[in-house]
Amino acid sequence: DGATFLLCETKSMDSASRKIVLEMIQLLNSKEVWIDRIHHDEIISITSHLPHLISTALVGTAKDNYEINEIMGMAAGGFDGATRLTRTNPEMIKDMYDTNSENINKFLKYFLDELMDLMDLQERDELISYLNNSVHWRRALSEKFGERPLS
């Protein structure tokens, strides 16, 4: 209820098919957003697929370096929030990767470059500036669209 459905037209889509989809969305009290398939795949790789892989990598880093009791004895909201996506069905993650690997790999490389840039920040002021830019952007996102509950 109230969800947004991102829809991509295909060459084979006719007006009857489109009408059925729109009626289903209306029955769910949701809204539709039509988006180009290529643009959709790029954005979804950042907003959905990449977070799953980052979450999984963080779990792998913790698992490979510490015993579970050590991690859980010290883990708090940050670890829980950052690794929540790792509970997702692995088959679904594999399917996401298989269908969008080109975009995922492109933005995974960009993400790795961001991490390397972060590691290179030696001056406190540089780090504060980097963090402030991210905080301001994320807060603006929340102000514009609100906070969604964690599920």
Question: Where do the protein language model's features map onto the residues?
Answer:
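Substrate/ligand-engaging "lid" and interaction regions
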Residues: 32, 43-79, 83-84
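An alpha-helix initiation/capping motif
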Residues: 37-44, 48, 128-132
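Amphipathic alpha-helical interaction surfaces
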Residues: 53-56, 88, 117, 140, ...
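Short, amphipathic C-terminal "tail helix"
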Residues: 132-151
